[in-house]
Amino acid sequence: MAGTSLVAGDVVVDALPYFDQGYDAQGVREAAAALVEEETRRYRPTKNYLSYLPTPDYSAFETEIMRNEFERLSSRQPLELLSMKRYELPAPLSGQRNDITAWQECVNNSMAQLEHQAVRIENLELMSQHGCNAWKVYNENLLHMIDCAQKDLQKLRKKIQDLNWQRKNSQLTAGARLREMESTWVSLVSKNYEIERAIVQMENEVYQLKERSGENKENIEDY
């Protein structure tokens, strides 16, 4: 918008994009790009503009697991497969068939897996009883969040539209005022030109009258 607003302390913002014409004319965009390129070449930074900042620590948020994984990737080692041993029920080895400790470990493993399956069954029962309602409540919360977000979005869009309308009306008003002032300026310049031409013409007439008066005076003196 035209006015006295300053950018960077010295630049007067006088663009009226809703009023000005000619931006789509051939060569205008290329000329603007050339001016920008010239400005960037003229003020290209001569040093690292981040030199005043401390050296970044990229490992600040790394965990032990992440570091081990990065080391594995850097050394090109294959990914360790997921162990399925906990889901198996192996019997004692042939050489340990008479070892009570080996059989006890197998029994403990079986009990742990049975307990795990029992917990899974309980979770499935809870899911069958309360899962539908919980899912409905979750969906209702999502719909409420979406509705609130949509309302906020509509408010923002309305604010943006109102602001654009205000800018457009202000710029069109300023543009009409500028056009009126330009027309007045052209009219005043034309009038000044007419006045100057009339003055020059009158000066010439006065000069001619003086010359005639002088000639008449000489003729009278001759008589």
UniProtKB/Swiss-Prot annotation:
GO cellular component: nucleus; U2-type catalytic step 2 spliceosome
Keywords for the protein's UniProt record, in alphabetical order: Coiled coil, mRNA processing, mRNA splicing, Nucleus, Spliceosome
Task performed by this protein: Required for pre-mRNA splicing as component of the activated spliceosome. May have a scaffolding role in the spliceosome assembly as it contacts all other components of the core complex.
UniProt organism field: Xenopus tropicalis (Western clawed frog)
InterPro entries: SPF27 (IPR008409)
Biological process according to GO: mRNA splicing, via spliceosome
Protein name: Pre-mRNA-splicing factor SPF27
One Pfam family it belongs to: BCAS2
Predominant location: nucleus
Subcellular location: Nucleus
Coiled coil: 139-223
Family: Belongs to the SPF27 family.
Superkingdom of origin organism: Eukaryota
Self-association state and partner proteins as the record states: Component of the pre-catalytic and catalytic spliceosome complexes. Component of the postcatalytic spliceosome P complex.
Organism lineage: Eukaryota, Metazoa, Chordata, Craniata, Vertebrata
